[in-house]
UniProtKB/Swiss-Prot annotation:
Species assigned in the record: Leuconostoc citreum (strain KM20)
GO molecular function, one term: ribosome binding
GO CC annotation: cytoplasm; ribosome
Name of the molecule in the record: Ribosome maturation factor RimM
Major subcellular site: cytoplasm
Subcellular location: Cytoplasm
Subunit-level organization: Binds ribosomal protein uS19.
Length: 172
């Protein structure tokens, strides 16, 4: 099974009720589009991807409650509890300048303007005003890099290389 053109948009964390709805914890900025009626998704299983189509969805307590077409009761969907949900690559929305998908940033190398290696992005935190990239540094505590123009100077998605201006106190 290759995941090359598939992008994770959430995880089925539980079932909801007896009619076959699932609770999905979304990890996408486009959750309303990803889980709208008619959306084509893929459930990852040990045997490969299982295609599903959204019949209905709604936001409930920061989780998406989703019912897939053809599912009429909990027994048909319970086996997918804890499985990840993906969208096929061609279904991704086009982003504007200075906007990136998580998988384009995660595992990117971070260097200073002078080329000094700082670490590798391991996580992205959504804080409200701007995202914060968690950078794993060898032998040091993680660095928190705000995704703002004053700090992030360039993002080379193809080479997974991010150049930042190390402002005073940023890496302390």
């Amino acid at each position: 099974m290759t995941k090359e053109n598939y992008f994770k948009v959430g995880t089925i964390v539980n079932t909801h009720g007896i009619r076959g709805e699932v609770k999905i914890m979304a990890i996408t900025d486009f959750a309303a589009d990803r889980f709208k009626k008619g959306a084509a998704l893929q459930i990852e299983t040990k045997q490969g991807f299982v295609p599903v189509t959204v019949q209905s969805s709604r936001l409930h307590k920061n989780m998406w409650l989703v019912l897939f077409e053809g599912v009429t009761n909990i027994n048909e969907i319970e086996k997918y509890k804890t499985n990840d949900i993906y969208v096929y690559g061609e279904a991704r929305e086009a982003l504007g300048d200075d906007e990136y998908y998580y998988d384009e940033i995660i595992d990117s190398r971070v260097v200073s303007l002078s080329g000094e290696a700082i670490g590798v992005v391991s996580e992205i935190m959504t804080t409200g005003a701007n995202d914060v990239w968690v950078v794993k540094r060898p032998g040091q505590s993680d660095a928190l890099i705000p995704m703002i123009d004053d700090v992030v100077k360039s993002v080379d998605v193809a080479n997974k290389l991010i150049t930042i201006d190390v402002l005073e106190g940023l890496l302390d």
